[in-house]
């Protein structure tokens, strides 16, 4: 089984530590995790590679939206994941979810970390994009 983790950054605590705890255990069962990162570095990169995972760097969606979309779509089409787990700060960040749905294939898990989003537009998007 191949799982793609989206939305983790270079902070070795919080969600990154949580996901790595799962990865350490699931890797023993032959489950593969790959990671998409739009920052210059991802936390635990060396350990990810030691456990058989891969890290794919894509452009930052805020700085290069079209570059992000192109790179993310190419990755999804090439790798064919069973599960795509999207970690996001609010439900307003729907770009990776929409792209995963467009490509199809695996199940998509949306994991939002905040109960609310600041700013009027973000609040509207947050509300509209909740299940």
Task: Briefly describe each language-model feature range.
Residues 1-131:
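Membrane-interface segments of envelope glycosyltransferases acting on lipid-linked substrates or membrane lipids
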């Amino acid at each position: 089984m191949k799982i793609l983790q989206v939305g983790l950054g270079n902070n070795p605590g919080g969600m990154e530590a949580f996901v790595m705890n799962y990865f350490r255990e699931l890797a023993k069962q032959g489950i593969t995790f790959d990671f998409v990162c739009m920052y210059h570095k991802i936390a635990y990169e060396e350990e990810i590679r030691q456990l058989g995972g891969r890290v794919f760097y894509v452009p930052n969606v805020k700085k290069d939206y079209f570059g992000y979309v192109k790179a993310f779509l190419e990755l999804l089409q090439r790798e064919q994941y069973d599960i795509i787990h999207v970690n996001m700060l609010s439900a307003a960040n729907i770009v990776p979810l929409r792209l995963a749905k467009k490509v199809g294939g695996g199940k998509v898990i949306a994991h939002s970390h905040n109960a609310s989003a600041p700013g009027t537009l973000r609040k509207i998007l947050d509300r509209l994009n909740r299940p």
